[in-house]
Design a protein with these regions (language model features):
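A short, proline-enriched helix->beta-strand linker immediately N-terminal to the Walker B motif
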Residues: 172-176
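ABC ATPase "signature
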Residues: 237-238
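Helix-to-loop junction immediately C-terminal to a conserved catalytic motif
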Residues: 50
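Catalytic Walker B motif of ABC-type/P-loop ATPase nucleotide-binding domains
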Residues: 178-181
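Conserved ABC ATPase signature
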Residues: 153-157, 161
Length: 261
C-alpha cells in the first residue's frame, strides 16, 4: 500500500475553488516535487495533508492512517488521536518558524521532549529519555552541518542555517513523510544551495518527501516523480524526464519554458 494516498481532494476559500479534485499516491522512499505557478494550489495540498487546513471533500491516507475522509468530516476526532497522526508527518515552512528565545539544540528538541511526556514511563525515565532525544538531535544536526552551532540562537544564524535547524527539528520526530513548502523561497540565492544539498542527501537516504518548489533543476535532479499543478488541478504527472523533457500538456511546456530562457 502507498505511504500517501490522496483522492479527489477539493478545497475552496470563500468562492475561490483552490483544489478541484486532486488525486495522487506516493510510495515509501520516493521524492515528489510539486511545481506550478503561484496560486495553483500547491501549498494548499500540503496544508490539507498536514491538517493545517480542512479539505471540503476527498480522502487522505498517510501510512495506513485515515487523515481525512470527506464522508465523515463532521465527526469529531479525539485531540490526542489527531496529534498522534500529525506526528506521522513533518512540515518545513518557508520562514523557518524558530523560537527566538531558544538556542539551536532547544529548538530542535522542544517538540520531541513535549511528545515524550506522553510516554507511560516518562516520569521514571525522564533524564534518560531526554538524553536520548538530545543525542538524536546532535546526530541530525551533525548531518545538516550545524553541530558547532548547538548553543547559538536564531538571531546569530544565517537564513540558510535557520532553515537547516527547522529541517533538523522535523527529522528528530522521525516522521513517515517530510513535507517542504518552498524551503528556499525566503533565502538569498547564494544560500539556496546549502538547503538543496541537505534535501538531496535526505533523498539519497530514502527519506520520503513531498517538496513544493520553484527550483526546476533541483526538482528534476532529486525527484522520483513530479506533479505540475495548474489552476487547482494536476495538469501533468510523471517522472522528471517525462514532465521536464517530454511534457504532453501545452500548459506544462509553457510553464517549463519560462525557466529555460
Amino acid at each position: 500500500m502507498s505511504i500517501l494516498e490522496v483522492k479527489d481532494l477539493k478545497k475552496s476559500f470563500g468562492k475561490t475553488e483552490v483544489l478541484k479534485g486532486v488525486s495522487f499516491t506516493l510510495e515509501e522512499g520516493e521524492v515528489l516535487s510539486i511545481i506550478g505557478s503561484s496560486g495553483s494550489g500547491k501549498t494548499t495540498i500540503l496544508r490539507c495533508i498536514n491538517q493545517l487546513e480542512t479539505a471540503d471533500s476527498g480522502y487522505i491516507n498517510v501510512a495506513n492512517e485515515v487523515f481525512f475522509d470527506g464522508e465523515n468530516k463532521d465527526k469529531k476526532e479525539d485531540p490526542k488521536e489527531k496529534r498522534r497522526k500529525q506526528l506521522l508527518v513533518g512540515l518545513v515552512f518557508q520562514n523557518f518558524n524558530l523560537f527566538p528565545q531558544y538556542n539551536v539544540l532547544e529548538n530542535v528538541t522542544l517538540a520531541a521532549k513535549l511528545q515524550a511526556k506522553e510516554l507511560p514511563d516518562y516520569k521514571e525515565n525522564k533524564a534518560k529519555i531526554n538524553e536520548e532525544i538530545d543525542r538524536k538531535a546532535k546526530d541530525i544536526l551533525g548531518k545538516v552541518g550545524l553541530l558547532e552551532k548547538l548553543e547559538n540562537y536564531p538571531c546569530e544564524l544565517s537564513g540558510g542555517q535557520q532553515q537547516r535547524v527547522s529541517i533538523a527539528r522535523a527529522l528528530v520526530l522521525e516522521p513517515k513523510i517530510l513535507f517542504f513548502d518552498e524551503p528556499t523561497s525566503a533565502l538569498d540565492p547564494e544560500l539556496t544551495g546549502e538547503i538543496l544539498k541537505v534535501i538531496k542527501s535526505l533523498a539519497e537516504e530514502k527519506v520520503t518527501m513531498v517538496i513544493v518548489t520553484h527550483e526546476m533543476s533541483f526538482a528534476k535532479a532529486v525527484s522520483s516523480k513530479v506533479i505540475f499543478m495548474d489552476n487547482g488541478v494536476i495538469e501533468e504527472e510523471g517522472t522528471p524526464e517525462e514532465v521536464f523533457d517530454n511534457p504532453k500538456s501545452h500548459r506544462t511546456k509553457e510553464f517549463i519554458s519560462k525557466f529555460e530562457d
